[in-house]
Amino acid sequence: MSQIPETSDIVLIGAGIMSATLGTVLKELEPSLSVTMLETLHDCGQESSQAWNNAGTGHAANCELNYTPQRPDGSVDITKALEVNTEFDISRQLWAHLVTKGAIPDPRAFLHPCPHMSFVWGDDNVAFLRQRHREMAAHHCYHGMEFSEDSAQIAAWAPLIIEGRKPGQPIAATRIISGADVDYGALTHLLVKQLQAQSGFSVHYKHRVVALARGDDGRWLVTVENVASAERTTISARFVFAGAGGGALDILQKSGIPEGNGYAGFPVSGIWLRCDVDDISVRHHAKVYGKAAHGSPPMSVPHLDTRIIGGKRSLLFGPYAGFSSKFLKHGSYADLLRSIEPGNILPMLAVARDDWQLSEYLIGQVLQTSEHQFAALQGFFPRAQREDWQRAVAGQRVQIIKPDPQHTGVLEFGTELVASADNSFVALLGASPGASTAAFIAMEVLQKCFDDRLTPDGWLGALKQMIPTYGIDLKQDAAACRDSRARTAKVLQLDFV
């Protein structure tokens, strides 16, 4: 392993998909930048980016019903879905750029075409899905979305969810074939590998950030400790990005920036049921998302997914949420307690007071027996057999608690960038939709922290080579949207309709 440099233009804390993506983008825009990546664990992509720590959905809001809430008048609001949908286009364009230039030799090393479906049962849910399809299919971003209430048609799309189902049960499904299953762990390794082939980049595993302070010259002094030897080194950095997943809050607090005052985290653990039986997994080729129970949080949306990891096809069902005080899967049970500061106690108490539905949901999930969990799977896959499935622990998700002038504190389920006043430090907090929008988040970091470089004489030309639709609203420009998706589908070997 290379020696830790004394100075670096950029320090990336965490070696997951977020840091790997931002590092890739910055080195594409300015190859002369010195970039140092720091990771506590032995390798990159070992926390939430690791393949079995997430669902591997290329989240484009094709099938996730929590992005399309129903209004009181019965209509469906697709605003959030369109945002997520076009944010995923940024990731597709970045990946296509890297494949085209040879930085990623084969897209099938991390990406596989996989239809995205929504599936519901019951009269009210069928009516909702019918209205949702009507509104989404009318928009160019969802061109080609199919809808059916016919069990034979749905069985042709996904036989396991129909076989053994009670005849006459009202059911409905939508399908869009342009979806994807993504191995974000494999992608993280590919991104870090191509970064390591470039001059000016170094990654240092088994090194933990223990202190962060501003120097007299305005640069950041990042103190890291070798977890094996306890030896400490300090790096002087012009810009610091904390993309450490659940560990980002700790880095934000260490930075001492006033913009981070009041922020806290609410950790949620996850459990999957996993099936590796070839005769079963080969018969299901889709990511099938259902409808969460009324009043439950977005993280509770159940889904039955195709996963392709290391060339092996498996099925995943879940998630079942739980509570753990860890902020990282490889973290400490003291993480939550250590994160409590005088400035964030009141926002945390306000969330405990106001978000009782989340507490009720988590208590219910924790108290669920294995029989209850398996019954939920059989709601999707009626003929599922217990001996074919095993439990798997997912990655930790740390939801954002932030100060709010009206409610003192609020709980948010998205992601948020918290930056210093001079934009020399930024931390990425939150959990969803996460990895799918890593490239979009990288664009947000550029706009927030490097806006002076986004000029025709600066990075703009290279940025538009990498992301050809940069500056174009794909929600409004149907031709640009279709052209981009046709081009990236061809390069990435995805289906296009």
Swiss-Prot record:
Does the UniProt entry include the keyword Flavoprotein? yes
Q: Please name the top-level EC class of this enzyme.
A: oxidoreductase
Q: Which reaction does it catalyse?
A: (S)-malate + a quinone = a quinol + oxaloacetate
For this chain, one GO molecular function annotation is: L-malate dehydrogenase (quinone) activity
* Pathway where this protein functions: Carbohydrate metabolism; tricarboxylic acid cycle; oxaloacetate from (S)-malate (quinone route): step 1/1
Alphabetical GO biological process terms: tricarboxylic acid cycle
Record's keyword terms, sorted: FAD, Flavoprotein, Oxidoreductase, Tricarboxylic acid cycle
Which InterPro entries does the UniProt entry name for this protein? FAD/NAD-bd_sf, MQO
Name its co-factor(s). FAD
Spans through the membrane: none
Question: What Pfam families does the database record attribute to this sequence?
Answer: Mqo (PF06039)
Documented EC number(s): 1.1.5.4
Q: Which NCBIfam families match?
A: mal_quin_oxido, PRK05257.1-1, PRK05257.1-4, PRK05257.2-1, PRK05257.2-4, PRK05257.3-2, PRK13339.1
Q: What family does this belong to?
A: Belongs to the MQO family.
This protein is called Probable malate:quinone oxidoreductase
Native source species: Rhodopseudomonas palustris (strain ATCC BAA-98 / CGA009)
